[in-house]
């Protein structure tokens, strides 16, 4: 996914680079493509289970204490995202914007996340929201913010994504 000539994953990685020691990407296609940007891509270890599969592979690849997850199809995130989620304390936090809960934009303490994911997957529970509830993650409201979404052709066009750019860089 490319917006205004910049890969969306690179755009997001740059935004959070000051806070991160490494950027991990959950992707099931074109993994070598991400290395061109200095990113480490990982395919789901359990196929076909949705976003929790990506979260599981990232949690197991993560070498730091904390894991910030951001969906690549968000339009924009506030620069205060990570500091505000971190202030919630505990095992992490989940973001909410004016459109509601954003379960794929969250911060996790990795040593709590790994066993929670293992327990959820052991009973075929594939809901990220449910796993977050089991962890007791608080919701942090970003009032006045709309993270947006890049799912439909209209969303992509309005965000500056060309059809050629988007088709060439999916994965």
Regions found by a protein language model. Give the residues of each.
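SAM-dependent methyltransferases
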Residues: 157-171
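Nucleotide and nucleotide-moiety/phosphate-recognizing core
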Residues: 1-128, 133-147, 154-156
């Amino acid at each position: 996914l490319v917006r205004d000539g910049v890969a969306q994953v690179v755009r997001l990685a740059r935004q959070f680079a000051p806070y991160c020691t490494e950027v991990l990407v959950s992707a099931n296609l074109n993994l070598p493509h991400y290395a061109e940007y200095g990113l480490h891509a990982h395919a789901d270890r359990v196929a076909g289970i949705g976003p929790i599969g990506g979260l599981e592979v990232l949690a197991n690849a993560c070498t730091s204490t904390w894991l910030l997850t951001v969906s690549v199809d968000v339009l924009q995130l506030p620069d205060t995202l990570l500091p505000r989620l971190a202030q919630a304390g505990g095992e992490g936090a989940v973001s909410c914007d004016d459109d509601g809960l954003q379960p794929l934009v969250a911060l996790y303490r990795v040593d709590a996340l790994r066993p929670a994911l293992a327990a959820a997957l052991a009973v075929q529970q594939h809901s990220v929201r449910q796993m977050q509830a089991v962890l007791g993650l608080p919701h942090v409201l970003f009032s006045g913010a709309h993270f947006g979404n890049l799912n439909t052709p209209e969303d992509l066009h309005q965000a500056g994504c060309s059809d050629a750019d988007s088709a060439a860089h999916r994965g």
